[in-house]
Amino acid sequence: MNKKATSTIKPIVKVIGVGCGGNNIVNHISTSHLEGFSFVACDMDAKVLEKSAAATTLQLGTDGLGSGNSPEKARVATEEKTDAIKQLFNDKPSMTFVVTCLGGGCGTGAAPIIARESKKMGITTVALATLPFELEGERRFSQASEGIQNLARNAEALFLLNNQYIKEQYCDLPINQAFAKADNLLMEVTKSLIRAMTKPKQATKRTSRIKEFFKRLKCK
């Protein structure tokens, strides 16, 4: 685990990007310089982590070469790093947001395990994820479906953004711009959910209300 910077401010919320897509979104969010938030990047690909803007990075696995689009490979690599994952929560944040893009290997296989470890430590854990475009193929959709089930079991709440819906709304745009729209929308959703806790004096009360809200939703 690599820490690029330290802070004396106790984080209210920890935002963890998992996989290349999740880390791209966290890179966007981290530029907002929100006080009291801790940003983490987790990936099997060392090159992705080198480009991360997150203060803390955690390489999953040992070869630094990525998952090869295999959720199972990512799952095994992440299970081997559970001790390091637990250390991410030593600062005892009130909430964890696990941000990922489902359908690939690392995000699909690793994100549920990271959410599980956060939840086991008594931290309110929320997952936010994008779903693949139809043109990405049946395999990615199948892997995304498995990822949804695993995330739902390991988080208090799971928010999904359908990339295909984004494509249909922006059908005149090239696919790379449609991807950018999806990233920006999930970024705004994430920021909106955590913005309610940015005022330190009201953070405890608001966090308690959000915990109660998720319990009533029965999203587990």
Predicted regions and their residues:
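Tubulin/FtsZ superfamily GTPase core signature
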Residues: 1-220
